[in-house]
A protein has these predicted regions:
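N-terminal signal peptide c-region/cleavage motif recognized by signal peptidases
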Residues: 16-19
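Feature captures hydrophobic
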Residues: 22-173
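Bacterial N-terminal signal peptides that target proteins for export
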Residues: 1-8
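Short, linear, compositionally biased motifs with a strong N-terminal bias
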Residues: 12-13
Length: 173
């Protein structure tokens, strides 16, 4: 087989395998959309955040907002998730680009960490308490409310490891 025919065989095999699904960039709007779907498939998040009353602290807007970003990629949030009470579930109703400019610090959250730290938390190397205590996760929001929801909060951090996201580049924005 000549080099040219071997190259043709490889090209045909690659096409037959279908396009490679590119992972969204970690903490990008596309990643947040996938994280929203993963949230809705996690019973700890959808059920326990109703049981504790967390989801009801929405200041009358009908949803809570979470902004997330990778600190080594800039100092502003790159993705937004909105969580709302739908029936008897705390469901993610939006995952995408940051749209909510004004957050309410008594209801909403901003979380940031270096990329490597997000990856560690996503693997379950440590939970939210240790992450915050050692400054690995910066957190703005209702701290007492968060303290009462450490189990669900940990599941949110584990979504980072469950939702595919490339760390080779930073989210655009």
């Amino acid at each position: 087989m000549t080099f040219r025919s071997a190259l043709a065989v490889c090209a045909v095999a690659a096409c037959a395998a279908g396009p490679l699904a590119a992972q969204p960039v970690l903490m990008s709007p596309e990643w947040a959309q996938a994280a929203c779907t993963a949230w809705n498939n996690d019973a700890v998040l959808t059920d326990q955040l109703v049981e504790t009353g967390w989801v009801k602290n929405d200041k009358g807007r009908g949803f809570k907002v979470m902004h997330v970003f990778r600190k080594d990629c800039g100092a502003t949030p790159t993705a937004e998730m909105r969580i709302a009470l739908k029936g008897d579930k705390a469901l993610c109703v939006y995952g995408g680009k940051v749209e909510t400019a004004q957050l309410d610090r008594s209801a909403d959250y901003v979380m940031s960490a270096e990329t490597a730290r997000w990856v560690e938390m996503g693997r379950g190397d440590y939970g939210p308490m240790r992450a915050m205590m050692f400054g690995r996760l910066e957190f703005v929001g209702p701290k007492m409310e968060a303290m009462g929801n450490m189990g669900p909060f940990e599941n949110f951090l584990l979504l980072v490891g469950k939702v595919p996201g490339s760390t080779q580049s930073c989210p655009a924005g």
